[in-house]
Every structure is written in C-alpha cells, then in structure tokens.
C-alpha cells in the first residue's frame, strides 16, 4: 500500500526510480525493505529482458520508427518502437490500473491471452450476442490468432513489461468490441481509439502514418466516417486497459459496449 501511495504522489521520474530500485534489488537477491515480491511473470521477464543504454534506446526508437514508416508490415519494428517510446505512458496506465479494482486484479493475476490459456471450444458454445462469441467470430472472419504477438524485451520494469504485453494481447479484443476488421482502414481507426485511450506514442504514430497509406477511396471513407467515429469513441470511452476481458466472455456485447461508452460505426 505504501508503495502504491508513493507512486501516485511522486513525480513520474521519481516514482519510476523508486520502483526500478526495488526491482533491481530483488533481481540481485539483496534485501529491499517494503518492496513487493516479484511474481512468476516478473521473474521470468527479468531473466529474458535485453538491457539497453539510454543511447541505445534512442537509436532503436529512431531506427524502428523509420523502418515502421517505410514498411508498416514490419511488426518487429513496430513492437520495438512501442517499447522504446512508451515508458512514460505505461507508468500512467499503471496508475490507472491501480485506481481500479478490476485493474488491480489484472495486475495481481497477470492473465495471458493465447490458445493455450483461453478455452475457445467453450467460447464457441456461447450465445452469438455475447462478447466471447463475438471474439471467436472476429478471429475466424479475419483469420488471425492470439498467438502471433511478439514478446516484450526492452522495457526495464517488469510491471511495465506486463502492461505492454497485455496491450498487445488485448488488441484483437479491442477490435472485437469496436467491431472493426483488421484491414488498413480498420487498423487505423482502432489505433486512434487506442492512442486516445492509452496515450501510447506508437498508437498515435500508427494512426497518423497509417492513414497516409490509405488508397483514395479508403481515405474518403476514413475522413468522412472512420476518423470522426474513432476520435469520438477514443475521447468518450472508459479506460480499456483495466477491463478484465476474460471475465466478460458471457456478457452481452451490446451491454459491454454501453458500459464502456463505445458505439459501433454504421458501415452501410
């Protein structure tokens, strides 16, 4: 509790330093008074993370941004960009998680979204108007899998690493609740909602530069319908990171959208 109060009250740089000092102390097995014990995810992440200097972080951030701009299909570069530019936004997201009972449960449980952790056979038995059924339909219609997300490697703090992991693994769930496909137009619209909802710089970059690559017909639809809808939902929706999606499978998807302040776009 004391650590949580410190993080909420101290400036960003100071609270980050306090937490990283605790993490590093535990990583070398030295005594760290008042430090929270590391859980399984955090211990494993500290073994696998790649430590980089501030210069290397700047170099990777710049290089990955250029590579992602030239080729938006370079998911490895997009992932690198997210990790090297998103730390401040992730600290803010962590505060949002800790301010919500549902978010606190997520941070305690650290659930993962994979075919090995989600009972998709069960989701297929749910009524079609439930969130779980809509998620399965989204995966099938767009021919995507939850197992395709890249592992986080460059963030120092394991809690922030989990939040970035959570963001990546929940991306398709955001598509589902927004009723957006995975084509370029749908991805750009979702990125705007995610950018305004999370503050992650990579989401803003994906939204702005992704729109540049739209074809003329797509761009007209984007400017007339998709962009206004995305901006409205991004500003109005409740924080999406603290939503424990795995506990919402049986919930009526229309009720879920209403609870979160989300409206779907009429694509007709």
UniProtKB/Swiss-Prot annotation:
UniProt pathway annotation: Cofactor biosynthesis; ubiquinone biosynthesis
Annotated EC: 4.1.1.130
Subcellular localization(s) per the UniProt record: Mitochondrion inner membrane
Reaction catalyzed: a 4-hydroxy-3-methoxy-5-(all-trans-polyprenyl)benzoate + H(+) = a 2-methoxy-6-(all-trans-polyprenyl)phenol + CO2
Spans traversing the lipid bilayer: none
UniProt protein name: Ubiquinone biosynthesis protein COQ4 homolog, mitochondrial
Statement: the UniProt record of this protein carries the keyword Transit peptide: yes
Disulphide-bonded residues: none
Taxonomic path: Eukaryota, Metazoa, Ecdysozoa, Arthropoda, Hexapoda
Pfam family, one: Coq4
Keyword Lyase recorded: yes
GO CC terms: extrinsic component of mitochondrial inner membrane
Membrane topology qualifier: Peripheral membrane protein
Lineage top rank: taxon: Eukaryota
